[in-house]
């Protein structure tokens, strides 16, 4: 996020319009909306449960000062990664880093200390006037760096991660109960979830 962006109010208003359109598109895409509802149901009132795009009300209300304050609070050297590849002069790169980023302050950096926990088991539903019923199930998974992530990836491939998976073969090919059905793992820094999705006729 380039700090100079905050100086151009016209650009901010333009980008807000783009994000509002993205939010509307998600609301009109049942599959996307179902995954968002699953995150809310599984993680409850925790940051990871919130939609990445935010809400239309939040986006409309944001000001330049709001974004500048967020940038100052969240973007620090301690949580940044600088990646360099190709034919370069390391001494020159170091010099440029010092020139461009040397004054980047870490004074107000506060690392997150709270761990994300799944909410109590429950169900979240939203009625929409559409032809299909979209269903998502969530189960506790593994966080990033867990040694068993390879096993979970293999399990997911067999269970529901491909057209040859058991979910796909049983529910779509054999039973004809749904056209779309799959599973997938999500891994975050301190939590994870294994999800199953299907779209079918309510009858």
Identify the residue ranges that each predicted region occupies.
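Charge-rich, well-structured scaffold segments of protease-associated domains
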Residues: 1-109, 125, 136, 142-143, ...
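His/Glu-based metal-binding/catalytic segments typifying zinc-dependent metallopeptidases
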Residues: 109-165
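Phosphate-proximal small/polar/acidic motifs at interfaces that engage nucleotide phosphates
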Residues: 168-169
